[in-house]
Design a protein with these regions (language model features):
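Acidic, metal-coordinating catalytic segment for phosphate/diphosphate chemistry
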Residues: 1-16
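A cytosolic small-molecule/anion-sensing beta-strand core signal
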Residues: 21
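Conserved Nudix-box catalytic region and its N-terminal flanking loop in Nudix hydrolases
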Residues: 24-63
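Nudix hydrolase/Nudix homology domain
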Residues: 35-39, 109-158
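Unchanged
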Residues: 47-70, 80-133
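Conserved S-adenosyl-L-methionine
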Residues: 72-76
Length: 158
């Protein structure tokens, strides 16, 4: 069994963080089961049974990046469908953070199965040169639409 099997053949709820600071967004370069090469994604991960989406995001962000988030506001709902994967992703804007950015790890994986390659604040201007997923985020960030107050829904299927 490979390390991506737990994510397939079910609907997975993920909580993700959009931490923007001085025209840059915090991103994690990591392996994902639907791509052949690593991608840049906002920090986040699965919501456990009985865990709130906000608490899941705070836990995942701390594990992956060393950063603690606060002042969370739901901004995007993204539905991702690519058989055998199906995820509902909740993207929260964070207005405050504490801690130093580090390359963290995922306690669900052994040391040899770690997915994270790099963690950094990436300038908006550099996003089009990177493999950022979900793809809608690049336009939302560069256009400033991420600052709007309503919750927006996006769907990606391949």
């Amino acid at each position: 069994m490979n390390s991506v099997d737990p994510y397939s053949n079910k609907v997975r709820v993920r909580s993700c963080g959009l931490l923007i600071f001085e025209g840059k967004i915090l991103l994690v370069k990591q392996n994902v089961p639907t791509r052949m090469s690593p991608v840049w994604i906002p920090p986040g991960g699965g919501v456990a049974l009985g865990e709130s989406a906000e608490l899941a995001l705070k836990r995942e962000c701390k594990e992956e990046t060393g950063v603690s988030l606060s002042g969370l506001r739901l901004r995007y709902v993204h539905e991702f469908i690519e058989k055998p994967y199906h995820a509902l992703e909740l993207y929260f804007l964070a207005d405050r953070f504490s801690g130093e950015v580090i390359k963290g790890s995922d306690p669900e994986h052994t040391q040899s199965e770690q997915l994270i390659h790099e963690v950094c604040f990436m300038p908006f201007d550099d996003l089009t040169m990177l493999n950022v997923v979900p793809e809608f985020l690049v336009d939302e960030l560069k256009s400033g639409r991420y600052l709007q107050s309503q919750i927006s829904y996006f769907k990606s299927d391949r």
